[in-house]
Swiss-Prot record:
Start and end residues of each Gnk2-homologous domain: 35-139, 144-248
Predominant cellular place of this UniProt entry's protein: secreted
PANTHER family per record: CYSTEINE-RICH REPEAT SECRETORY PROTEIN 29-RELATED, CYSTEINE-RICH REPEAT SECRETORY PROTEIN 38-RELATED
GO terms for cellular component: extracellular region
Protein name, entry field: Putative cysteine-rich repeat secretory protein 36
Family: Belongs to the cysteine-rich repeat secretory protein family.
CDD domains named in the record: Gnk2-like
Keyword Iron-sulfur: no
Signal peptide (residue range): 1-28
Length: 251
């Protein structure tokens, strides 16, 4: 009787522990993939309902949804002539191509319509990135304006200078990998830091020519804003970088 009771008690404890672990994993995934930031491009003005601009916008949104399979996680589509010209740039994180990217598409679309209702131009960042604009910038131009940073509130406990140098060097190595012709402007990896692992990724929009220049600038900006932080990211419309002390990419 005693051994049967002990076994049942162990099974209950194991079940509770498994559920708690699952909840933590789901919560972590939700935090990783959740809405990050948005920007309504007020300077580009607003459009009226049932206008030619709205017609062009809705056409592109529906066209991408019905035709794109996102094999490389990216699309840049335009329609119309000024003042009703619309261009959409959509890109998924480098670990979310194909069907994962396709399922991600609806989230920023609904988010941008809710947060920037009626604005001709808007940008939203979550696991996917969406940029709607009336301006078709040439791919040689890096957008240094529409950027932001986020970081863990806690600092590392170990030698901060050593941590910063190793993190910076690791991001530079990933930058060089992402800049290679067949890399798809994306690289990710992990490295050992004492008793912990450091996880990082770098990614450029597929339509910019100078990926290395953009990433190098972003790494420098990250060093200014997020010195000694346990995790941080710097995001823009041309490229983005991130590092954490826990795995955050899909496998």
């Amino acid at each position: 009787m005693h051994s049967s009771y002990s076994l049942s008690k162990c099974l209950v404890c194991f079940t509770i522990l498994a559920i708690q672990t699952l909840i933590r994993r789901v919560s972590s995934l939700n935090r990783t993939n959740a809405y990050l930031n948005h920007k309504c491009l007020v300077i580009q003005g607003k459009y009226k309902r049932q206008s030619e601009y709205e017609e062009n916008l809705n056409y592109i949104i529906d066209h991408i949804s019905s035709t794109q399979k996102f094999p490389d996680g990216f699309t840049h589509t335009s329609r119309g002539e000024a003042p009703n010209f619309v261009t959409i740039v959509f890109q998924c994180r480098g670990d979310s191509y194909g069907s994962k990217c396709r399922s991600c598409y609806a989230t920023p679309i609904s988010g941008i319509r809710r947060r920037c209702q009626g604005y001709k131009g808007a940008i939203i960042w979550d696991q996917c990135f969406l940029d709607i604009s009336t301006i078709n910038s040439p791919p040689t131009m890096i957008d240094y304006e529409n950027t932001f940073s986020m970081h863990n509130q806690n600092n590392v406990n170990e030698d901060a200078e050593s941590f910063n140098k190793k993190t910076r060097d690791f991001l530079y190595n990933l930058m060089l990998k992402a800049d290679k012709p067949k890399a798809g402007s994306y690289a990710a990896g992990e490295m050992r830091l004492g008793t912990k692992n450091l996880y990082a990724m770098v990614q450029c929009a597929l339509d910019i020519f100078e990926c290395k220049v953009c990433l190098e600038w972003s790494i420098n900006e990250l060093s200014k804003c997020c010195h000694s932080k346990k995790g941080a990211r710097f995001l823009g419309t041309s490229c983005n970088i991130r590092y954490e002390l826990y795995p955050f990419l899909s496998t």
